[in-house]
Every structure is written in C-alpha cells, then in structure tokens.
From Swiss-Prot:
It is found in: Cytoplasm, Cytoskeleton; Nucleus. The keyword Cytoplasm applies. The gene is Pbxip1. Residues 270-350, 377-405 form a coiled coil. The modification Phosphoserine is found at residues 131, 142-144, 164, 563. PANTHER family: CELL CYCLE PROGRESSION PROTEIN 1, PRE-B-CELL LEUKEMIA TRANSCRIPTION FACTOR-INTERACTING PROTEIN 1. The keyword Cytoplasm applies. One of its GO terms (cellular component) is chromatin. Regulator of pre-B-cell leukemia transcription factors (BPXs) function. Inhibits the binding of PBX1-HOX complex to DNA and blocks the transcriptional activity of E2A-PBX1. Tethers estrogen receptor-alpha (ESR1) to microtubules and allows them to influence estrogen receptors-alpha signaling. The C-terminal domain (AA 443-731) contains a nuclear export signal. Association to the cytoskeleton through a N-terminal leucine rich-domain (AA 190-218). A motif (Nuclear localization signal) lies at residues 486-506, 691-716. This is Pre-B-cell leukemia transcription factor-interacting protein 1.
Amino acid sequence: MASCPDSDNSWVLAGSENLPVETLGPEPRMDPESEGASQALRDSSKADGKELAGTLDGEEKLFQTESSQRETAVLTESAAKGTLGADGHGTEAPGDTVVQEDSQETPVATSLGPDTQDLESEIHPQNLPSSPRAVWKEHRCSSSDDDTDVDVEGLRRRRGREPSSSQPVVPVDVEDQAKGEGIGGELGISLNMCFLGALVLLGLGILLFSGTLLEPETGPMEEAELQVFPETGPETELVETLGNRQDEIEHLQASSVPPDSVPSLQSMGFLLDKLAKENQDIRLLQAQLQAQKEELQSLLHQPKGLEEENARLREALQQGKTSHQALESELQQLRARLQGLEANCVRGVDGVCLNWGGDPQDGKATKEQGHKGQEPDPSLLEQHKQLEAEAKALRQELQRQWQLLGSVHWDLQRGLRDAGRGAPAHPGLAELGHMLAQTLQDLENQGINTGRSPNDSEAWHQKKPHTQSPREWGGKEKWRGGQRDQKAEHWKPRKEESGQERQRSWRDEGREHTGRWREDRLRADESGSRKDSKRQDPKVHPRKDGNSHSVERQKHSWGKDNSPDALSSWEELLRRKYRPPQGCSGVADCARQEGLALFGVELAPVRQQELASVLREYLSRLPWAGQLTKQLPLSPAYFGEDGIFRHDRLRFRDFVDALEDSLEEVALKQTGDDDEVDDFEDFVFGHFFGDKALKKRSRKKEKHSWNPRVVGPREEHSRHPHHYHQG
C-alpha cells in the first residue's frame, strides 16, 4: 500500500519475499482547521464543477488532452480502493504499484463564480491548495492519517525523517497563483466594470465631439447604445471577462453595429460626412482668424505712419494759420489806407469820387522833394504809385468819354443832315448839336491844358469814332434819371462860367462836362426814336434787333481808334457773347427755323468754304480791305469739325451782324465813314436766301414802317432809309 508522499511515516510492503522498502514521502502535518477547509473546498469545487460543466465549454476543450490520461488513473485508483476497502470509510487505498503523480490528478473545473470567490475570500491564501491535484493529495493524506492505527495486511509502516521546517513548504508559483486568484476574486467585477465604463465614456466622448447627441436624429444611435449594453446574467459577464480584450472590443463593435442594421450604417456615414464638413469649416475659420490676425498686426504697424501724417498735417495747419494771420494783418492795413483815401475823397452828386485829395502833379512834386531831402516812407511811395495808376485810369476814362461825345456829335450831325434831306427834325436838335459842339471845344481846351496837343484833339475829332446810338447809351444811364432834372437846371449857369473856373483839375472838369452831356440825353433820345421803331419789328434788320451788339461794338471800339492793325476788329468777334436759338434741336433744324422766321425761306446749313468765298468776293470790292482778306474770322468756335456753321449755338443773322459791325469799325478807321459797308448784310443774305427773299422782306419793312398804328407821333421821322441805322 502506498502512503502519502508528505507524511512522516512510510508504508512498506511486507511479504514473504522481503521486497525492498520504498519511501513515499513525509506525512504532511495539517491542523484540523486546514483539513476541514480543504474538505469543504473539495466538496464545493466538485459541486461547482458539476454546476458549471455546461457553461465552460471552452475550458473543457482545453483539458481534453488531459482527461484521457486521468481516466486511466481513475480506473487504477478505483481498483486500489477495492483492494484496500477494509477501513470502512470509503477512502482510496494504494495498490501494489506506485501511482504516478500525473495519473492521480482528476479533472476539476475551476471557475470564478460568486460562490467560489466568496469561499476563497474567507480562506487564507497560504492555506488554499494551488490546484485540484493538491486537493486530491490532501484527501489521500487525510485518509492515510485516519488509517495510521489500522493494521494492513501485507504492509507495515515505519517512521520517516522529520521535515526541516514545521510549516509545509508551498511552492512560490502556487502561492502567487493563490494570491492572484484571491485578488481576482475581490477585484474581478470592479476591474471589468471599470473597463466597460471606460469604453462607454470613450464612445460618449466620440459622439459628443461629432455633435450627434445635439441633433434631433438620435434614433439609430440610441438603438446602438442599447445594443452595446444588453442585460445579461452575471455568469455570462464573468465568462466574457475571461476572454481576450481584443475579442471583447470586436464583440462590442459587432454588437453595437449589427450586420442587418443598414440605417445605422447610413446614419454613421452621414455623421462622418458631416464631421468632414465641420472639419473643413473649422479649417476655413482658422484661415479667417489667421487673416484677421495678420490684418491686426498690419494695423498695429500703421499708427506710425499715421502719426507722421498727423505731424505733417499739423505743420501745414500751423503754416496756414500763420499765413492767414499775415493776410488778415495786410487786409487791415489795406482797409486803413482805403479809409484814409476815402476821407480825402471829394464826391460828386452821383456819389462818384471826383477828387482823391490832391493832383497827381502835386504828388510828383512831393515825390521829387522827398528824393532831394531824405528817403520817404515806403508806404508813401507805394501810395504815390497807386495814385499815379489811378490817374492813368482816369485819363483813359476821360478819353473814352471824349470818344463817346464825339460819336454823339457825329450822330447828331447825321441826323441834321438827314433832316436837311427832307425828314422832319426835332425843334431842339440843332440847339443840342450846338451845345455838344461847345462842350467838345471846351474839352479840347482842357486837353491842351493837361498836356494833350490840339492836333491830337483835331485828329480824334476827324476820325469821328463811331459807337452806339444816343438812344442806346441813354438806356444805360436810366438809373441816373432821377438826377438829370437837377443837372438840367444848372446847365446854362455852368455854360456861362468863367475861364478861370474851367482851369480846375482835369478830372473834375471831365466829370462836369460828362454830366452836362448826360443832362442833354433826354433831348437826344427823341432823335433816336426812329431806331426804336425798327426794333419793335421782329423781322427788321438783324443788326437792329437788340442792343447787345451795338453796346459791345462801342466797348471794343474804345481805345482801338488809333490802332493801325485792322485785323483787331476780326479778333473782337471771338469775345462776343451770342444768344443761342430757342425752340430747335440740331444744326439743320435750327437753320431751317431761322430761315423761315427771317425770310420765310428754309435755310440750309451754312458751310465754311461757301461763306469764306462770299466774304472774299465782298471784300475784294473795298480798296482798303486787303488785310482783312488774309485772315477771315471763321474760327472753330463758329464752325464744327465738318465745316458746318453751328446753328444750334448761335443764330446766323447774329454772326452776320457782328461781321458788319466789325467792317463798319474798320471803315471808320480807314475812311471815316461806315456807309460803304451798309450793303454787307444784303449781299450775304442775298447769296444764301436769294434776291426774291430780300425784296419780299424789304416790302414788308416798308409796309410796317408806314403803318400809322405802329409809328407814333414822335416816330414819323423813322420812315427814312435803312442806312440811317448804320451809324
């Protein structure tokens, strides 16, 4: 009979042949508590093994190779039990042969169920057997201890050697395994739950990052979450925790997305697409933020340039203020000087300053005395210069007044000449002419006293500068009509003044004689009534239509009488201002309407070359107009690029009237008479409209001029020929 290998005593086979004694090993010393615990562990292990035999299919496959060997060992053990069953306790008895350690193991299924874990937690890890093999060994040893006092036939027991230590020797790997199983029993569920919780938190984090939990379409994801955590029993959870972690992750993914859940896959694809779009939006936002950052950095560098610009602007503003202050001071000085000059000014009845406080000759003498003595004040020198300039301007004004009086005298002479031809003359016309002749003689005398030679006065008188009619000039002076009555009362007393009083300053004398002439304009207006009757007719000669051309002709004729250049009269045409036609649009339309209004015949647009040939033909008749033919007044201001007259900007009859006025001025300068060019308008209009239109127009003019309803009592003398108005 074999004994326990860890017992103190050894069983020896006794026989007649005196077989050799085989030592089976020392008998383990175990206390009753350890034996009870091991017995309970063995019973519970067997019970749990039977209960979990159906669930641990994976473990049975792992022990299939060992089960065949263990069946042979069990059969041998059962045979030994039958031989050694004399003790009556149903324990295993050793056979005639020594049972190997590998054949003594029985298949015991280990499990980490809750009952086993609770039992193992109550037992100290050092007292727990490391495996079912150890449990079987303890069971054998305990059965051997029970049979120590029983005599077995053919066997005898002897005392073996004592072990080196009082405590049983437990292998290190067995102890570590026991400790690990104890710890696993305590923390197995908590670690698995922590692992599952970490997976759940990871999934929730992914869902939160993608934003799917914030959307209303959460049906498929909720189903997936329900599938991730199915309600299974504790045994299934424990079995799953024993598997590989990779298998659990794959199982989790397979359970969360089943193969037949197509809508869930579509929703996941939709979520992935949306996530990609959101990532793209995030990249765009990052690019915008980067651009804004760069812009802010550039704006941070700009204040330096702005500060420099502000400094320049401040400097410019300061300079402007300084210049403004200087100009204000200069203006104050000019105002003070002007007030001083006005204080010394002697004003006439009409409010015009007649004397500025001294004669220019006195100023020259004062200036010479200042040079002889000491240097005068620069302000005084400047004042003297201004006075000299004013004196020069006054001389020019006086010259213009002389020219005006000469033109009036010439008009009166022509009126008297026309009256001698049979026209009724006004009773006071001869007296007015005599008074004007006397005035001119007085002015000539004053011209001699002021340094003008009598020859100059006579030459000027012979040239007879032609200006606007007395009626037209009287229209300019209507605003002074309130003072004419007062001046008329003093006409005769002033005429009889002594020669000493006439020797006053040339400025005062000129003003006085000008005033005398203005007083007599009321009488001279009657002589120009014939021109007024012509102006009332809208179809009369274009040159007599308005006052603008005659007024401008007089303005431009002043100061031009002594000029030898006859082409200056052409240049005056460019300075005229013409009234544009009304009620038409376009060159052709305006030309047609003008012809119908003037002659009752449509006028074709005038061409520059045609008009130039007409002018050359007419000027060739005049012996003194050779210079005028060299440069005709056909500037681009009157003709377009195509050579067509600009009928839409000015009327053609106004342009012809201006040409006639210029020719009259040249005729006055060259011959002293402008009657030579009286037929200029008829010549030009006869070329463009025909002689029939001119005859028709002349008959209308005669009929209109002899109509008693049009001609007033003072306008009877206006029935005389047309050339009277050329003056």
